[in-house]
Design a protein with these regions (language model features):
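Bacterial N-terminal signal peptides
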Residues: 10-29
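N-terminal hydrophobic or amphipathic segments with adjacent small-residue motifs
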Residues: 18, 61, 72, 81, ...
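Mature exported/compartmentalized surface modules and terminal targeting/interaction regions
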Residues: 2-11, 31
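Exported/periplasmic cell-wall-interacting domains
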Residues: 2, 6, 47, 99, ...
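Cell wall/extracellular polymer interaction/catalysis modules
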Residues: 31-104, 112-126
């Protein structure tokens, strides 16, 4: 995909060079660029069709592309006092090795990596007066394995599972959270 993206950028740049582009078009040398640009769109198209479905009652998150279910993983969700929000959302941003800030023990500490409370992958999906909600890894796999309702509203996944989901979706991927 990176190669296709580079080729496409090269193909788009010559538009500012109209005489060269016209000569290339007449000579037929532009066709490979057009084919590469189409190939990139074909490769990227399925990602736009992807959506994430979180079923709170099953405590399961599923990646769907078109009508095909690509993966399903157990999750821990928000505690009843701080529930995971329901509704239609989209992935707002994606972070590798996000920083988790804690003030426990009276001092500010920054934690990151798979042993931090949010693991080594984080995808934000909603912001409101309570803060930001995300799908992330965890340092406590037990809560995910028993599909507990223990978080402050975020969705916790096993670190290996969030990495799979993280790599399969883009920012703006749709997220449906339902009961």
């Amino acid at each position: 995909m990176n190669t296709l993206r580079l080729v496409s950028l090269v193909c788009l740049m010559p538009w500012s060079l109209a005489p060269v582009m016209l000569a290339g078009l007449l000579a037929g040398s532009v066709l490979p660029c057009l084919a590469a640009e189409s190939a990139e769109l074909a490769v990227r198209q399925p990602a736009r069709e992807s959506r994430i479905v979180l079923d709170l009652s099953k405590r399961q998150i599923t990646l769907v592309r078109g009508e095909q279910r690509l993966g399903a993983w157990p999750v821990a969700i928000g505690d009843p006092k701080t529930p995971t929000p329901k509704g239609e959302f989209a992935i707002l941003n994606k972070k590798v090795n996000p920083i988790y800030v804690t003030h426990k023990s009276g001092q500010r500490r920054e934690l990151r990596g798979p042993s931090s409370p949010i693991g080594d992958r984080y995808m934000a999906f909603h912001r409101n007066g309570r803060g930001e909600f995300g799908i992330h890894g965890t340092a406590w796999p037990h809560w995910v394995q028993i599909r507990a309702a223990v978080s402050l509203g975020c969705v916790r996944m096993l670190n290996s599972h969030i990495r799979q989901l993280f790599d399969a979706v883009d920012v703006e991927t749709r997220l449906e959270i339902r009961s």
